């Protein structure tokens, strides 16, 4: 269920959101990043992902979000669970009036680049980086870098 913008703003203002992040790896061990067009994290390079909707199973969310973010519908079994993560942002989808808090379920995926049909609705451009390049990238968001940080727990929390 998608909410009207006013209702969604009330939810974001008062509760954490649940989302899925996809750590997509190609055959060369590079990770897919997209440059975000929207708040929060606008302008930063970020792994693909998105929110789970109310009354949506994780299986349905995974299939919907892989289609929306990668251009290919994948089953939950295609991913390897990579832990629970916390993302905090000073802004939100519409303004800087209030913060956004996500509880994120990370999933690692190996996908052939030729299978992807990367859409432009959420990301202006895409690139593949090695984990080392990703960690060194100034404009790679800290929440995406955290998936590869040597200081990060092995599985999120």
From Swiss-Prot:
Record's cofactor remark: Binds 1 Mg(2+) ion per subunit.
Catalysed reactions, as listed in the record: GDP-alpha-D-mannose + H2O = D-mannose + GDP + H(+)
PROSITE patterns attached to this UniProt entry: NUDIX, NUDIX_BOX
Keyword annotations: Hydrolase, Magnesium, Metal-binding
Binding-site residues for substrate, renumbered to this chain: 2-3, 8, 36
Residues annotated as domain Nudix hydrolase: 3-153
UniProt: Mg(2+) binding residues: 49, 69, 122
Family annotation (InterPro entries): GDPMH, GDPMH_Gmm, NUDIX_hydrolase-like_dom_sf, NUDIX_hydrolase_CS, NUDIX_hydrolase_dom
Enzyme class: hydrolase
Gene3D superfamilies tied to this protein: Nucleoside Triphosphate Pyrophosphohydrolase (3.90.79.10)
GO MF annotation: an example: magnesium ion binding
Cofactor: Mg(2+)
Motif (Nudix box): 50-71
Keyword Metal-binding attached: yes
EC code(s) of this entry: 3.6.1.-
Quaternary structure note: Homodimer.
Family under the similarity heading: Belongs to the Nudix hydrolase family.
Function according to Swiss-Prot or TrEMBL: Hydrolyzes GDP-mannose.
PANTHER family in the cross-refs: GDP-MANNOSE MANNOSYL HYDROLASE
Name under which the protein is recorded: GDP-mannose mannosyl hydrolase
Protein's organism: Salmonella typhi
Encoding gene, per UniProt annotation: gmm
């Amino acid at each position: 269920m998608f909410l009207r913008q006013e209702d969604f703003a009330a939810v974001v203002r008062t509760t954490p959101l649940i989302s899925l992040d996809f750590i997509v790896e190609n055959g060369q061990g590079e990770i897919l990043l997209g440059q975000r067009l929207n708040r929060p994290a606008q302008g930063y390079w970020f792994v693909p992902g998105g929110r789970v909707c109310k009354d949506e199973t994780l299986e349905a969310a995974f299939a919907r979000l892989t289609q929306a973010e990668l251009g290919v519908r994948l089953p939950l079994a295609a991913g390897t669970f990579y832990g629970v993560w916390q993302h905090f942002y000073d802004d939100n989808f519409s303004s800087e009036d209030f913060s956004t808090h996500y509880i994120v379920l990370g999933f690692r995926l190996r996908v052939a680049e030729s299978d992807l049909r990367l859409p432009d609705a959420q990301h202006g451009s895409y690139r593949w980086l090695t984990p080392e390049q990703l960690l060194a990238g100034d404009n790679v968001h800290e929440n995406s870098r955290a998936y590869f940080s040597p200081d990060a727990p092995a599985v999120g929390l």
